[in-house]
Amino acid sequence: LLGNDDFLLDLISRGAHQSEINDYVAFILKATQCIGIKVVNPGGINAFKFNQRALNVDENSIRYKITPRKIVRILARAVYELGVPHPLHVHCSNLGVPGNFKSTIETIKAAEGLPVHITHIQFHSYGNNGDRNFSSASAEITEYVNKIPNLTCDVGQVLFGQTATMSGDSMKQHANHSHAHPDKWLCMDIECEAGCGVVPFKYTDQSFVNALQWAIGLETFLLTEDPEKIFLTTDHPNGAPFTSYPHLIKLLMDKTFRDDLLDRMSVDISEHTILKEIRREYTLSEIATMTRSAPAKILGLTNKGSLSINSDADITIYDSTIKDIEEMFAKPTYVIKDGNVVVKNGV
Protein backbone atom coordinates (compact mmCIF):
# COMPACT_ATOMS: atom_id res chain seq x y z
CA LEU A 1 0.00 0.00 0.00
CA LEU A 2 1.48 3.30 -1.12
CA GLY A 3 -0.01 6.76 -1.54
CA ASN A 4 -0.40 7.57 2.15
CA ASP A 5 3.09 6.82 3.43
CA ASP A 6 5.04 9.84 4.59
CA PHE A 7 8.18 9.04 2.61
CA LEU A 8 6.37 9.02 -0.74
CA LEU A 9 4.18 12.02 0.06
CA ASP A 10 7.26 13.96 1.13
CA LEU A 11 8.98 13.09 -2.16
CA ILE A 12 5.97 14.28 -4.15
CA SER A 13 5.56 17.47 -2.12
CA ARG A 14 9.23 18.34 -2.66
CA GLY A 15 8.82 17.92 -6.41
CA ALA A 16 11.00 14.82 -6.74
CA HIS A 17 11.67 13.64 -10.29
CA GLN A 18 9.62 10.69 -11.54
CA SER A 19 12.76 8.55 -11.67
CA GLU A 20 13.27 9.06 -7.93
CA ILE A 21 9.66 8.03 -7.29
CA ASN A 22 10.22 4.96 -9.47
CA ASP A 23 13.30 3.99 -7.46
CA TYR A 24 11.31 4.13 -4.23
CA VAL A 25 8.43 2.08 -5.66
CA ALA A 26 10.91 -0.49 -7.00
CA PHE A 27 12.54 -0.72 -3.57
CA ILE A 28 9.16 -1.32 -1.90
CA LEU A 29 8.29 -4.04 -4.43
CA LYS A 30 11.59 -5.82 -3.83
CA ALA A 31 11.60 -5.40 -0.06
CA THR A 32 8.05 -6.68 0.40
CA GLN A 33 8.09 -9.26 -2.42
CA CYS A 34 4.56 -8.19 -3.36
CA ILE A 35 3.09 -8.53 -6.85
CA GLY A 36 1.69 -5.03 -7.24
CA ILE A 37 1.04 -1.57 -5.82
CA LYS A 38 -2.29 -0.50 -4.36
CA VAL A 39 -3.36 2.96 -3.28
CA VAL A 40 -6.25 3.25 -0.81
CA ASN A 41 -8.07 6.59 -0.63
CA PRO A 42 -5.01 8.35 -2.10
CA GLY A 43 -3.71 10.90 0.38
CA GLY A 44 -6.91 10.63 2.41
CA ILE A 45 -5.68 8.25 5.07
CA ASN A 46 -2.67 10.44 5.75
CA ALA A 47 -4.91 13.51 5.82
CA PHE A 48 -7.17 11.75 8.35
CA LYS A 49 -4.20 11.56 10.72
CA PHE A 50 -4.17 15.37 10.62
CA ASN A 51 -7.91 15.52 11.40
CA GLN A 52 -9.23 15.92 7.87
CA ARG A 53 -12.46 13.94 7.61
CA ALA A 54 -12.75 14.03 3.79
CA LEU A 55 -10.41 14.62 0.86
CA ASN A 56 -11.69 15.04 -2.68
CA VAL A 57 -9.71 14.32 -5.83
CA ASP A 58 -8.53 17.90 -6.39
CA GLU A 59 -8.33 18.94 -2.74
CA ASN A 60 -4.98 19.54 -1.07
CA SER A 61 -4.10 17.62 2.06
CA ILE A 62 -3.28 19.78 5.08
CA ARG A 63 0.15 18.30 5.78
CA TYR A 64 1.68 17.81 2.33
CA LYS A 65 -0.40 20.18 0.18
CA ILE A 66 -0.85 17.62 -2.62
CA THR A 67 -3.99 16.20 -4.21
CA PRO A 68 -5.20 12.61 -4.70
CA ARG A 69 -5.13 13.28 -8.46
CA LYS A 70 -1.41 13.93 -8.35
CA ILE A 71 -0.73 10.84 -6.23
CA VAL A 72 -2.64 8.59 -8.64
CA ARG A 73 -0.95 10.09 -11.70
CA ILE A 74 2.56 9.69 -10.28
CA LEU A 75 2.03 6.16 -8.94
CA ALA A 76 0.32 4.97 -12.13
CA ARG A 77 3.31 6.20 -14.12
CA ALA A 78 5.78 4.56 -11.72
CA VAL A 79 4.06 1.18 -11.95
CA TYR A 80 3.86 1.45 -15.74
CA GLU A 81 7.46 2.56 -16.25
CA LEU A 82 8.77 -0.18 -13.95
CA GLY A 83 6.96 -2.79 -16.04
CA VAL A 84 4.93 -4.23 -13.17
CA PRO A 85 2.41 -6.63 -14.79
CA HIS A 86 -0.52 -5.54 -12.63
CA PRO A 87 -1.51 -1.88 -13.12
CA LEU A 88 -1.92 0.48 -10.20
CA HIS A 89 -4.70 -0.96 -8.03
CA VAL A 90 -6.88 1.96 -6.89
CA HIS A 91 -9.37 2.24 -4.04
CA CYS A 92 -10.83 5.63 -4.97
CA SER A 93 -11.64 8.62 -2.79
CA ASN A 94 -15.08 8.99 -1.18
CA LEU A 95 -15.99 5.32 -0.85
CA GLY A 96 -19.69 4.88 -0.12
CA VAL A 97 -20.51 8.59 -0.38
CA PRO A 98 -23.64 9.50 -2.41
CA GLY A 99 -22.53 11.25 -5.60
CA ASN A 100 -19.06 9.68 -5.50
CA PHE A 101 -19.25 8.50 -9.13
CA LYS A 102 -17.95 11.95 -10.10
CA SER A 103 -14.77 11.55 -8.06
CA THR A 104 -14.40 8.00 -9.41
CA ILE A 105 -14.45 9.33 -12.97
CA GLU A 106 -11.94 12.03 -12.03
CA THR A 107 -9.68 9.37 -10.48
CA ILE A 108 -9.83 7.39 -13.73
CA LYS A 109 -8.89 10.54 -15.64
CA ALA A 110 -6.01 11.15 -13.23
CA ALA A 111 -4.16 8.16 -14.69
CA GLU A 112 -4.00 10.06 -18.01
CA GLY A 113 -4.51 6.95 -20.11
CA LEU A 114 -2.03 4.75 -18.25
CA PRO A 115 -3.23 1.30 -17.12
CA VAL A 116 -5.21 1.40 -13.89
CA HIS A 117 -7.44 -1.05 -12.03
CA ILE A 118 -10.35 0.31 -9.97
CA THR A 119 -11.19 -2.04 -7.14
CA HIS A 120 -14.65 -2.69 -5.60
CA ILE A 121 -16.07 -0.20 -8.09
CA GLN A 122 -19.64 -0.81 -6.90
CA PHE A 123 -18.86 1.20 -3.74
CA HIS A 124 -17.74 4.08 -5.97
CA SER A 125 -20.71 4.14 -8.37
CA TYR A 126 -23.28 6.13 -6.40
CA GLY A 127 -25.34 9.10 -7.50
CA ASN A 128 -27.25 11.46 -5.22
CA ASN A 129 -30.53 11.79 -7.10
CA GLY A 130 -34.03 11.08 -5.83
CA ASP A 131 -35.87 11.87 -2.64
CA ARG A 132 -33.36 9.82 -0.63
CA ASN A 133 -30.31 11.48 -2.24
CA PHE A 134 -28.94 8.05 -3.14
CA SER A 135 -29.09 6.54 -6.62
CA SER A 136 -27.31 4.29 -9.08
CA ALA A 137 -24.57 5.69 -11.32
CA SER A 138 -23.53 2.33 -12.76
CA ALA A 139 -24.38 3.47 -16.30
CA GLU A 140 -22.06 6.47 -16.04
CA ILE A 141 -19.23 4.38 -14.60
CA THR A 142 -19.52 1.46 -17.03
CA GLU A 143 -19.49 3.91 -19.93
CA TYR A 144 -15.90 4.70 -18.93
CA VAL A 145 -15.02 1.06 -18.29
CA ASN A 146 -16.27 0.13 -21.76
CA LYS A 147 -14.52 2.91 -23.67
CA ILE A 148 -11.12 3.24 -21.98
CA PRO A 149 -8.71 0.50 -23.20
CA ASN A 150 -6.35 0.45 -20.20
CA LEU A 151 -9.06 0.47 -17.52
CA THR A 152 -10.14 -2.65 -15.63
CA CYS A 153 -12.17 -3.11 -12.47
CA ASP A 154 -13.61 -5.57 -10.00
CA VAL A 155 -17.09 -5.09 -8.59
CA GLY A 156 -17.23 -5.73 -4.85
CA GLN A 157 -20.77 -7.10 -5.01
CA VAL A 158 -22.99 -6.65 -1.94
CA LEU A 159 -25.02 -9.70 -0.90
CA PHE A 160 -27.38 -9.82 2.06
CA GLY A 161 -26.23 -11.18 5.40
CA GLN A 162 -23.78 -10.64 8.24
CA THR A 163 -20.17 -9.86 7.45
CA ALA A 164 -17.26 -7.76 8.67
CA THR A 165 -15.80 -4.87 6.70
CA MET A 166 -12.01 -4.70 6.81
CA SER A 167 -10.19 -1.87 5.10
CA GLY A 168 -7.04 0.20 4.97
CA ASP A 169 -9.34 3.22 4.57
CA SER A 170 -9.42 4.30 8.21
CA MET A 171 -11.07 7.59 7.20
CA LYS A 172 -14.10 5.74 5.85
CA GLN A 173 -14.17 3.05 8.52
CA HIS A 174 -14.21 5.70 11.24
CA ALA A 175 -17.10 7.43 9.47
CA ASN A 176 -18.97 4.10 9.33
CA HIS A 177 -18.44 3.01 12.92
CA SER A 178 -21.91 4.17 13.98
CA HIS A 179 -23.35 1.51 11.64
CA ALA A 180 -21.42 -1.34 13.28
CA HIS A 181 -23.50 -4.50 13.78
CA PRO A 182 -22.77 -5.79 16.34
CA ASP A 183 -21.60 -2.57 17.94
CA LYS A 184 -17.91 -3.35 18.29
CA TRP A 185 -15.36 -1.86 15.91
CA LEU A 186 -11.68 -0.98 15.59
CA CYS A 187 -9.69 1.73 13.81
CA MET A 188 -5.99 2.36 14.24
CA ASP A 189 -3.06 3.88 12.41
CA ILE A 190 -0.25 3.28 14.92
CA GLU A 191 2.86 2.25 12.96
CA CYS A 192 0.70 1.94 9.83
CA GLU A 193 1.93 3.47 6.58
CA ALA A 194 -1.72 3.43 5.55
CA GLY A 195 -4.58 2.71 7.95
CA CYS A 196 -6.67 -0.07 9.42
CA GLY A 197 -10.36 -0.36 10.24
CA VAL A 198 -12.61 -3.30 11.09
CA VAL A 199 -16.36 -2.67 11.33
CA PRO A 200 -18.85 -5.58 11.50
CA PHE A 201 -21.86 -5.00 9.28
CA LYS A 202 -25.13 -6.66 8.33
CA TYR A 203 -26.54 -6.06 4.85
CA THR A 204 -30.31 -6.46 4.70
CA ASP A 205 -32.92 -6.13 1.96
CA GLN A 206 -34.99 -4.11 4.45
CA SER A 207 -32.53 -1.26 3.92
CA PHE A 208 -33.09 0.91 0.84
CA VAL A 209 -29.37 1.67 0.62
CA ASN A 210 -28.26 -1.98 0.93
CA ALA A 211 -30.88 -3.14 -1.59
CA LEU A 212 -29.77 -0.53 -4.10
CA GLN A 213 -26.11 -1.41 -3.51
CA TRP A 214 -27.02 -5.00 -4.44
CA ALA A 215 -28.64 -3.78 -7.66
CA ILE A 216 -25.81 -1.38 -8.53
CA GLY A 217 -23.26 -4.18 -8.38
CA LEU A 218 -25.30 -6.40 -10.68
CA GLU A 219 -25.90 -3.50 -13.08
CA THR A 220 -22.15 -2.94 -13.22
CA PHE A 221 -21.46 -6.57 -14.11
CA LEU A 222 -24.17 -6.67 -16.75
CA LEU A 223 -23.44 -3.30 -18.38
CA THR A 224 -19.71 -3.99 -18.79
CA GLU A 225 -19.37 -5.45 -22.26
CA ASP A 226 -16.01 -7.22 -22.06
CA PRO A 227 -15.58 -9.89 -19.34
CA GLU A 228 -11.82 -9.37 -19.58
CA LYS A 229 -12.27 -5.90 -18.06
CA ILE A 230 -14.37 -6.77 -15.02
CA PHE A 231 -13.69 -9.35 -12.33
CA LEU A 232 -16.02 -11.25 -10.04
CA THR A 233 -15.47 -10.14 -6.45
CA THR A 234 -17.45 -9.37 -3.33
CA ASP A 235 -14.47 -7.45 -1.93
CA HIS A 236 -14.28 -10.33 0.56
CA PRO A 237 -15.43 -9.94 3.23
CA ASN A 238 -16.63 -6.34 2.85
CA GLY A 239 -19.55 -6.93 0.48
CA ALA A 240 -20.01 -10.61 1.27
CA PRO A 241 -17.79 -13.66 1.91
CA PHE A 242 -16.25 -15.30 -1.15
CA THR A 243 -18.19 -18.46 -0.29
CA SER A 244 -21.21 -16.69 -1.79
CA TYR A 245 -19.67 -16.70 -5.30
CA PRO A 246 -21.93 -19.55 -6.56
CA HIS A 247 -24.99 -17.49 -5.61
CA LEU A 248 -23.54 -14.43 -7.36
CA ILE A 249 -22.75 -16.40 -10.50
CA LYS A 250 -26.35 -17.61 -10.62
CA LEU A 251 -27.56 -14.01 -10.38
CA LEU A 252 -25.43 -13.16 -13.42
CA MET A 253 -26.40 -16.21 -15.47
CA ASP A 254 -30.14 -16.35 -14.69
CA LYS A 255 -32.27 -13.25 -15.36
CA THR A 256 -35.44 -14.88 -14.02
CA PHE A 257 -33.71 -15.66 -10.73
CA ARG A 258 -32.43 -12.12 -10.20
CA ASP A 259 -35.78 -10.59 -11.25
CA ASP A 260 -37.57 -12.81 -8.71
CA LEU A 261 -35.21 -11.69 -5.94
CA LEU A 262 -35.71 -8.06 -6.94
CA ASP A 263 -39.49 -8.51 -6.78
CA ARG A 264 -39.27 -10.08 -3.32
CA MET A 265 -37.21 -7.27 -1.78
CA SER A 266 -38.57 -5.95 1.51
CA VAL A 267 -38.13 -2.43 0.12
CA ASP A 268 -39.18 -1.36 -3.36
CA ILE A 269 -36.20 -0.20 -5.42
CA SER A 270 -37.76 -0.94 -8.81
CA GLU A 271 -37.97 2.74 -9.76
CA HIS A 272 -34.34 3.31 -8.76
CA THR A 273 -32.63 0.56 -10.78
CA ILE A 274 -32.52 -0.47 -14.44
CA LEU A 275 -31.77 -4.07 -13.47
CA LYS A 276 -35.02 -5.48 -14.88
CA GLU A 277 -34.43 -3.73 -18.19
CA ILE A 278 -31.12 -5.54 -18.67
CA ARG A 279 -31.75 -8.81 -20.51
CA ARG A 280 -28.16 -10.02 -20.55
CA GLU A 281 -27.25 -13.34 -18.97
CA TYR A 282 -23.58 -14.28 -18.60
CA THR A 283 -22.50 -17.40 -20.47
CA LEU A 284 -20.35 -20.11 -18.91
CA SER A 285 -17.51 -18.98 -21.18
CA GLU A 286 -17.82 -15.40 -19.90
CA ILE A 287 -17.79 -16.63 -16.29
CA ALA A 288 -14.63 -18.62 -17.04
CA THR A 289 -13.02 -15.52 -18.56
CA MET A 290 -14.02 -13.26 -15.68
CA THR A 291 -12.94 -15.66 -12.92
CA ARG A 292 -9.97 -17.47 -14.48
CA SER A 293 -8.18 -16.27 -17.60
CA ALA A 294 -8.67 -12.51 -17.24
CA PRO A 295 -7.48 -12.26 -13.60
CA ALA A 296 -4.43 -14.39 -14.43
CA LYS A 297 -3.66 -12.14 -17.38
CA ILE A 298 -3.92 -8.86 -15.47
CA LEU A 299 -1.77 -10.25 -12.63
CA GLY A 300 0.90 -11.40 -15.07
CA LEU A 301 0.48 -15.08 -14.08
CA THR A 302 1.24 -16.57 -17.48
CA ASN A 303 1.07 -20.15 -16.18
CA LYS A 304 -2.43 -19.73 -14.72
CA GLY A 305 -5.94 -19.38 -16.12
CA SER A 306 -5.33 -21.54 -19.18
CA LEU A 307 -5.61 -25.16 -20.33
CA SER A 308 -2.70 -24.79 -22.75
CA ILE A 309 0.41 -26.97 -22.69
CA ASN A 310 2.82 -26.11 -19.83
CA SER A 311 0.14 -24.25 -17.87
CA ASP A 312 -0.33 -25.23 -14.23
CA ALA A 313 -2.84 -28.07 -13.86
CA ASP A 314 -5.31 -26.04 -11.77
CA ILE A 315 -8.65 -27.29 -13.07
CA THR A 316 -12.22 -27.37 -11.80
CA ILE A 317 -14.72 -29.80 -13.32
CA TYR A 318 -18.46 -29.27 -12.85
CA ASP A 319 -21.42 -31.56 -13.44
CA SER A 320 -23.42 -29.84 -16.17
CA THR A 321 -26.41 -32.13 -15.54
CA ILE A 322 -27.08 -30.23 -12.31
CA LYS A 323 -29.75 -27.76 -13.39
CA ASP A 324 -29.35 -25.30 -10.52
CA ILE A 325 -26.38 -23.06 -11.38
CA GLU A 326 -25.67 -22.16 -7.76
CA GLU A 327 -25.60 -25.81 -6.70
CA MET A 328 -23.36 -26.74 -9.63
CA PHE A 329 -20.74 -24.13 -8.75
CA ALA A 330 -21.00 -24.84 -5.00
CA LYS A 331 -20.31 -28.57 -5.44
CA PRO A 332 -17.67 -29.13 -8.12
CA THR A 333 -17.15 -32.71 -9.22
CA TYR A 334 -13.38 -32.29 -9.14
CA VAL A 335 -10.97 -29.56 -8.09
CA ILE A 336 -7.44 -30.29 -9.27
CA LYS A 337 -4.52 -28.25 -7.88
CA ASP A 338 -1.08 -28.68 -9.43
CA GLY A 339 -2.30 -31.93 -10.95
CA ASN A 340 -3.57 -33.34 -7.65
CA VAL A 341 -7.24 -33.95 -6.87
CA VAL A 342 -8.07 -31.92 -3.76
CA VAL A 343 -11.90 -31.98 -3.97
CA LYS A 344 -14.15 -34.77 -5.23
CA ASN A 345 -17.92 -34.48 -5.44
CA GLY A 346 -17.96 -31.23 -3.50
CA VAL A 347 -15.82 -32.35 -0.53
Feature locations, PLM:
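Mid-domain alpha/beta scaffold segments of enzyme catalytic cores
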Residues: L1-E20
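C-terminal cap of metal-dependent C-N hydrolases
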Residues: K297, D312-V347
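Polar helix-capping/helix-linker motif
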Residues: I148, D254-K255, I325
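A generic structural motif
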Residues: L1-D5, V116-N128, D154-V158, D260-I269, ...
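Short, glycine-/Ser/Thr-/acidic-enriched flexible segments
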Residues: G44, L95, F123, V158-F160, ...
